[in-house]
Amino acid sequence: MLNKRTTEVYALGQHISMSAHKARRVIDQIRGRSYEETLIILELMPYRACYPIFKLVYSAAANASSNMGSNEANLVISKAEVNKGTIMKRLKHRARGRSFAIQKPTCHITIVMKDISLDEYIDTDSITWSQNKKKDTTMPYYDMYSNGGTWDKK
């Protein structure tokens, strides 16, 4: 079994004042893409969620070049997730002395980038397991109408 170098870096943004549903709409577009392609997509999309995600992707790439010394052309977004954060509750004053509750949602965004040039070691145990696996399995065919099935039983 070969030990693999750590090839992943991450950037985490917490308490971003935005709905998690709106941030997921942008995150789904960039998951699995390269770093340069992601920056182009985020600059051209017209959503408010693009700017904090752009900053996180840029920060993750800076972490990769600082910590591992990797080139930005080799980076790929391997995992991107949006989690629901705390909800800030405020009051909106209305007519006749009434007030309504306003909920301001927040979200936590995690961007994990992987350097594909450092992925040169392969785990030998996983290769032997997949080769030993049986290739074809025979499935028995049961026809429920020919043997009566459960229709004739009470």
From Swiss-Prot:
SUPFAM superfamilies xref list: Ribosomal protein L22
Subunit-structure text: Part of the 50S ribosomal subunit.
Record-linked InterPro entries: Ribosomal_uL22 (IPR001063), Ribosomal_uL22_bac/chlpt-type (IPR005727), Ribosomal_uL22_bac/org-type (IPR047867), Ribosomal_uL22_CS (IPR018260), Ribosomal_uL22_sf (IPR036394)
Presence of keyword Ribonucleoprotein: yes
Family stated for the protein in its record: Belongs to the universal ribosomal protein uL22 family.
Cross-referenced Gene3D superfamilies: Ribosomal protein L22/L17 (3.90.470.10)
Pfam family, one: Ribosomal_L22
Annotated compartments: Plastid, Chloroplast
NCBIfam families: rplV_bact
Function: This protein binds specifically to 23S rRNA. The globular domain of the protein is located near the polypeptide exit tunnel on the outside of the subunit, while an extended beta-hairpin is found that lines the wall of the exit tunnel in the center of the 70S ribosome.
Protein known as: Large ribosomal subunit protein uL22c
Swiss-Prot/TrEMBL keywords: Chloroplast, Plastid, Ribonucleoprotein, Ribosomal protein, RNA-binding, rRNA-binding
UniProt keyword annotation of Ribosomal protein present: yes
Regions crossing the membrane: none
Main location: plastid
Domain of life: Eukaryota
Biological-process GO terms, alphabetical: translation
Gene Ontology cellular component list: chloroplast; large ribosomal subunit
Single GO MF descriptor: rRNA binding
